[in-house]
Amino acid sequence: MQIGPYTIAPKVILAPMAGVTDKPFRLLCKRLGAGLAVSEMTISDPRFWGTRKSLHRMDHAGEPDPISVQIAGTEPQQLAEAARYNVDHGAQLIDINMGCPAKKVCNAWAGSALMRDEDLVARILSAVVRAVDVPVTLKIRTGWDCDHRNGPTIARIAQDCGIAALAVHGRTRDQHYTGTAEYATIAQIKAALQIPVIANGDIDSPQKAAQVLRDTGVDAVMIGRAAQGRPWIFGEVAHYLATGALLPPPSLAFVRDTLLGHLEALHAFYGQPQGVRIARKHLGWYAKDHPQSADFRAVVNRAETPEAQLALTRDYFDALIAGVPPPLHAAA
């Protein structure tokens, strides 16, 4: 798949997720097979660009090309300025968020709430495309609710405004993440456009990725929640699409080493105590399908230092590898 001058291969992409797709996670997913990793959204209001959170979100040093940064907001010129600012700070692709269903985002008329105002959508897209010399992409949902499934109209507006690629989550805003994603609307959008279209929503296995690509005709798939605690899913999907064969499940040693490396990257990126705190949700995701995961989380979430967090994690997985009960009572 081509987005401007950038070839995206393999055609499996890490979706932007607030509080998840930070630099350590993007680097990990790219290393494990993602063709593109989109940053968590950065707010367009310049009053917040100097905050600790924003500075972390705008740190792209050492990331492989292309660097894709998502921006969120409601005011066309403010979003245009945010796009320019992020390009000046390393962004090679600008992604506009019109897909986030979170109440606090939609109440501010950002995210998927923008889909209710098609004229405003056109003004925002035109302003951002004119503001920067890099490709601009867009992420949307299929509509606001089942009675207002205007994704195809928004998609046509996006293409007419110069958007370089479009990602579509197969739910409406009012569904949030309930029910199941539908891909018929995505197929309809793909059939009507000339720009690349990316399907998102409930793509949680190599077989599902292949099915969605086949059934919709889209150019790539985007994976979000299924990558939490499973960053190797990108390599699994890429291998299946290339060969038609499934990779064996990752070994416990591979999971342990991947998680320990992820923890170390979080500790280094955020410092103490923030790195330990942010790592806790990732620990829960990695451990959720393993024996005594609830007991492990109860113990490891009490760790206050990087050293303790790493030691508890290593001991837990070493015990699983050895086939003995994890020493959780001793660690507590």
Swiss-Prot record:
Necessary cofactors: FMN
First-level EC class: oxidoreductase
GO molecular function, one term: tRNA binding
UniProt-annotated binding residues for FMN: P16, M17, A18, Q70, K139, N200, G201, D202, G224, R225
Catalysed conversion reaction: a 5,6-dihydrouridine in tRNA + NAD(+) = a uridine in tRNA + NADH + H(+); a 5,6-dihydrouridine in tRNA + NADP(+) = a uridine in tRNA + NADPH + H(+)
InterPro entries in the record: Aldolase_TIM (IPR013785), DUS-like_FMN-bd (IPR035587), DUS_fam (IPR001269), DusB (IPR032887), DusB-like (IPR004652), tRNA-dHydroUridine_Synthase_C (IPR024036), tRNA_hU_synthase_CS (IPR018517)
EC number, as in UniProt: 1.3.1.-
Xref: PROSITE patterns: UPF0034
Keyword Cytoplasm set for record: no
Superkingdom of origin: Bacteria
Keyword vocabulary terms for this entry: Flavoprotein, FMN, NADP, Oxidoreductase, RNA-binding, tRNA processing, tRNA-binding
Catalytic residue positions: C100
Record has Zinc as a keyword: no
Function: Catalyzes the synthesis of 5,6-dihydrouridine (D), a modified base found in the D-loop of most tRNAs, via the reduction of the C5-C6 double bond in target uridines.
PANTHER family linked to this entry: TRNA-DIHYDROURIDINE(47) SYNTHASE [NAD(P)(+)]-LIKE
NCBIfam families according to UniProt: nifR3_yhdG
Family as reported in the entry's similarity comment: Belongs to the Dus family. DusB subfamily.
Name of the protein in question: tRNA-dihydrouridine synthase B
